[in-house]
Amino acid sequence: MKEFLTPELADIQAAGLYKNERIITTEQRAAIKVRPDSDVLNFCANNYLGLSNNPRLITAATEAMRTHGYGMSSVRFICGTQDLHKELEAAIADYFHTDDAILYGSCFDANGGLFEALLTDQDAIISDALNHASIIDGVRLCKAKRYRYANADMTELENCLKEAQAQRFRVIATDGVFSMDGNVAPMDKICDLAEKYDALVMVDESHSAGVVGKTGHGVAEQFDLYGRIDIFTGTLGKAFGGAMGGFTTGRKEIIDMLRQRSRPYLFSNSIAPGIVGASIEMFKMLKESNALHDKLVDNVNYFRDKMMAAGFDIKPTQSAICAVMLYDAKLSQDFAARMQEEGIYVTGFYYPVVPKGQARIRVQLSAGHEREHLDKAIAAFIKVGRELGCIK
């Protein structure tokens, strides 16, 4: 295998697609250090509410480990369920206004273990073309008939639903916020079509929960769809503290069946008590105040408006993801490298992560960013943008 992998790795490197991991030597926050001892402002983390280093969550994690131990050494159905796990599942269900919730090691596992457990070859899954890789992989593991519609294209979705009418069940699967463009799925229209064609609706809230909606409660709040979305999946690794862990929440019968049949749930260790305890505390914090969400919204609006005024081409967004369009792959790499020299940590994305000719810098805003952080990033964008001929 070595003889095969070595030239393939060389090809990846030659194509400029090799992924190098930058080493961070501080906690995850707005201002970080990366090796070799470089101070940068972080604009590429999923730390939307700025909770990754929150002292209250660290204290809660420490206390949970003191009372409930470091790890579970078991899957849930043997001896891996503590009272903390049930408390967190109840908090998730309460947050999303659903019947029940089930925890996974990651949202990748939640999506990977969803469809196979519920659907057969008599059923159909209709999936948005820009859905996350975990949904794509989950669909591949399932025997249901597969349909795909162009991103947020309701005409194509309706055509797929018409084609799938002979199937027993139809499930529409979509991200709430699409991670590369930052656009919010048109959930109101999706739910209308689901009702018209008798389909279930599943939405991955990984980039939308904690972010979109009047108080950050996600797409159901944004579009007033409580009771009309059947299945939510999501992560504890982004807005909700940034540690790890995923979940599925929805109707009781669906969650009960996942506990019986979902393979990543049945055959993976339970989430560690420290993460569970901190996550419970995080949901308490979000119940007490909307201040973090309000600050995030202010930061997004300020950054987007200033960047557009400077002449940058910004994808429309209602999320914390701001796509600065550069279109050329090499330009996106050069731009990101120059930004790091200016003390701003951003990432360039290009084919095959995004379509050819759609290269961009993806900026992720956080409630952890202060106004001076935003101003420094905007000034760096303008300086580098002028140097590289992106703006006048």
Name these PLM-found stretches.
Residues 197-200, 207, 212-318, 331:
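Active-site C-terminal subdomain of aminotransferase-like
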Residues 47, 147, 151-203:
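Active-site phosphate-binding strand-loop segment of PLP-dependent enzymes
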Residues 114-133, 154:
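Conserved PLP-anchoring active-site segment centered on the Schiff-base-forming lysine
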Residues 75-81, 89-113:
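Short loop-beta-helix segment that forms the pyridoxal 5′-phosphate
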Residues 294-303, 308-343, 353, 357-358, ...:
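Conserved PLP-binding catalytic core of the aspartate aminotransferase-like
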Residues 2-68, 199:
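N-terminal "arm"/small-domain region of PLP-dependent enzymes with the aminotransferase-like
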Residues 106, 126-142:
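Substrate-binding/gating loop at the entrance of the active-site cleft, primarily
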Residues 55, 59, 63, 67, ...:
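PLP-dependent enzyme catalytic core of the Aspartate aminotransferase-like
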